[in-house]
Amino acid sequence: MKQLEVGDRVKILDGGKDDEGTVLDVDERTEMVIVYLGRHVGGRAFHRDDLRKVRAH
């Protein structure tokens, strides 16, 4: 299981080439991660397998 933490920068694997965001919350029980994608998009929930860590906070 990928270890993601609040503040990590992540790339959304099923998104476009510029779809990166910041982890806001991680639910270990459901393996869902809330990612902030910017002020125009806001936060979205993704399964942790759909994300790749770009760099740590």
Cite the ranges covered by each PLM segment.
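Basic/aromatic-rich interaction segments and small domains that mediate binding to polyanionic partners
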Residues: 3-56
